[in-house]
Design a protein with these regions (language model features):
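Hydrophobic membrane-insertion alpha-helices, especially the h-region
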Residues: 16-34
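Acidic (Asp/Glu)-rich catalytic clusters
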Residues: 71-78, 96-108, 130-139
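Short, well-structured secondary-structure segments
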Residues: 80-87, 105-120, 142-144
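Acidic-and-aromatic substrate-binding clefts and catalytic sites of carbohydrate-active enzymes
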Residues: 60-70, 86-97, 117-125, 153, ...
């Protein structure tokens, strides 16, 4: 059956739109796949098999973005300690900190709290934010200062020195208040740029999610 010019034009338009749609979907899938691969490479492991013979004591760190946590289930999963996000910067308090702290203790999980360090904020004021919101008993784990580069920030040597000074001020303020030396949590990049050689007196917690660390001598993983 012969098609009119109008029908041919309409069919050509449908074909073009269909091709464009396929290309857009394919491009979107590539972006999605790349995003998933990037996430898996840097942030997720798809689950880590724990050798309980080598590592009989296991723990987790949590924050509000984990949502509501069933702490009984956590304990039943052989997780015996937890570091819980308490504060960030000079005035932010994690909205689930008190809830997580209370319920973890109720389920016989040993707890510790951590502060997320903001590079552009005063170190002492950040320590006071943590101090004003976290009371530690003798049975609790030491305070943790989470120091990680974020947002693709670049630093000159001058600004690096300023950040290092503020990290030191934060750690010293925490140590004087709690009379316990804090733990420094960081990742490889931040360790190389800010921590290495500057905070050797502090226990170091390196973020290495999916495999045992190879670059540093470590106590446990």
């Amino acid at each position: 059956m012969a098609l009119s010019k109008k029908q041919k034009k309409k069919r050509r338009r449908i074909i073009i739109l269909s091709v464009v749609g396929v290309v857009v979907l394919a491009f979107g899938y590539l972006i999605y796949s790349y995003g998933i691969d990037y996430y898996r490479k840097y942030y997720a492991c798809g689950g880590v098999e724990i050798d309980y013979y080598r590592f009989p004591v296991t723990g987790i760190d949590v924050a509000s973005h984990q949502g509501k946590i069933d702490w009984k289930e956590v304990y039943d999963s052989k997780v015996y300690f937890a570091f819980i996000k308490a504060t960030e910067g000079e005035n932010f308090v994690d909205k689930r900190f008190k809830e997580n702290w209370k319920e973890a203790k109720q389920n016989n999980i040993i707890v510790g709290a951590y502060h997320f360090f903001r590079f552009n904020k005063d170190g002492k004021e950040q320590a006071y934010n943590f101090i004003n919101n976290v009371s530690l008993s003798a049975d609790d784990l030491p305070p943790v200062l989470d120091v990680e580069l974020y947002g693709g920030n670049k630093y000159t040597q001058e600004t690096k020195n300023k950040v290092i000074s503020e990290i030191f001020n934060c750690l010293r303020t925490l140590e004087r208040h709690y009379e316990r030396r804090p733990i420094v949590y960081t990742n490889i990049e931040t360790y190389q740029n800010f921590i290495k050689g500057n905070f050797d007196d502090y226990d170091l917690w390196i973020c290495k999610l999916c495999s045992e660390p190879k670059t540093l001598d470590w106590t446990f993983w």
